[in-house]
Amino acid sequence: PQERTLLPSTSYFYARPEVLADAQKAKAIEAFLAAFVRAGKWSNANAQAWGEHYYRRFQKLDAESASAIQSSLSPLIFQTAGEAQPHHQRLMDTLLAAGSLPRRLDAKDSFVSTFDAVVTANR
């Protein structure tokens, strides 16, 4: 749909500071993110095969439903912390304007660049 080109869907991975400070856990997050980005890149490039496998065989949806779902989705985009901040700031500013936040928040406080290299290397 047109709205997906205007404001794409957003996904974030959250980790508590104590998890990021643990070298073993940070290494596990790094491995997970690398695999997740590669899988997303593949599903973007192979939408028909992904839809057949996931929506038709795994979810057991009919072809029409699977097609409708897939046509409503935007491609997965994998951004570094700095690349994601402007979109996140717009979302927070929208929530502030709607009265859902008590004060303005700064998006730069929501991100760490710890995993930027793994995202960049795998996208």
Placement of each model-derived feature along the sequence:
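Poly-acidic low-complexity segments
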Residues: 1, 46, 83-87, 106, ...
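Short beta-strand->loop
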Residues: 1-8
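Short secondary-structure boundary/hinge segments and terminal tails
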Residues: 6, 72-74, 111-115
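A bilobed periplasmic-binding-protein/Venus flytrap-type ligand-binding module shared by bacterial periplasmic
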Residues: 8-25
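Glycine-rich, flexible loop/turn motifs
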Residues: 15-16, 69, 107, 111
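Secondary-structure end/capping motifs
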Residues: 21-102
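Conserved C-terminal helix/tail region of periplasmic/extracytoplasmic solute-binding proteins
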Residues: 93-123
